Amino acid sequence: MWFKNLQLHRLPAPWKVSVEQMEKWLAPHAFQPANSVETTRQGWTSPRNNGSLVYSINQQMLITYRAEKKLLPASVVTQVTKARALELEEQQGFKPGRKQMRDLKEQVTDELLPRAFSIQRDTRVWIDTVNGWLVIDAASQALGDDVLGLLVKSVDRLPISSVRVAQAPVAAMTNWLLAGEGPVNFTLDQDTELRSPAEGNATVRYVGHALEADDMRRHIEAGKQCMRLAMTWNDRVSFVMTPSLTIKRVTALDVIKEASDPTAQNDDEQFDSDFTLMTGELAKLFDGVVDALGGELDEGSKAA
């Protein structure tokens, strides 16, 4: 159940909001399947499929965003529209004009939508009301923006802000590669990407390859900067850091997996244990990442 890709946002620490209040905010935006003429739908759904829109334990909340999309290939619409256009041409004795073609396409789309397949995708959101984190489990920035957009619409005056650190992640990652070692409690793994900001964006990627200090220095002296860096925190969690501070490819290592509660009697107890373990470890990881980047900035301060 561990989150894999972490888009981080800040909340007040602590954020004094109850589960009941959160349920009240989300309920008007609960997910409902798209009707016959809609191509997309979004809303909140139960994280545990028990009717509740908010799962909570130890002041850690979990909510789930669901998006539905109808699959209606443009090629199918075009094919049917062309066939209808030929029929119309025979009836009226001349080819349909632009407006007629546009109307035909809209008509065909409306007719085909009820028969279109639909897909639903869920995206999880963790709200740490104690330490003031809001975390979206999404690799795509566009998806994260969609989730955040609905959350802002749902929650009355959501007190959210971006994470602002003293040192830009690109500069920090580049310096760590130059030094050949990570900051305190972090080790460098064997995946990285270096890219030149100059025209052409010359890029070098290392995957499962030792990051030799001489090689790193040569690339950096040539003007390249580190854009992705695989790291491990405290021998407990491995991940990839990015320029936007999105933490990707999060993996709990064996020492954490072994800490999972062996006495759990059912799925609910196991979920409680796993979620508590994940939120506790990741909250400490976030503190470590922020410290490694020089700490958080006050409003109005600029990153180095």
Curated annotation (Swiss-Prot):
One GO CC term on file: bacterial nucleoid
UniProt entry keywords in alphabetical sequence: Cytoplasm, DNA recombination
Entry's localization field: Cytoplasm, Nucleoid
GO biological process: DNA recombination; regulation of DNA recombination
InterPro entries: RdgC
Example of a GO MF term: double-stranded DNA binding
Pfam families recorded: RdgC
Matching NCBIfam families: PRK00321.1-4, PRK00321.1-5
Known function: May be involved in recombination.
Family according to the record: Belongs to the RdgC family.
Record HAMAP family: RdgC
The protein, known as: Recombination-associated protein RdgC
Organism: Paraburkholderia phymatum (strain DSM 17167 / CIP 108236 / LMG 21445 / STM815) (Burkholderia phymatum)
Gene: rdgC
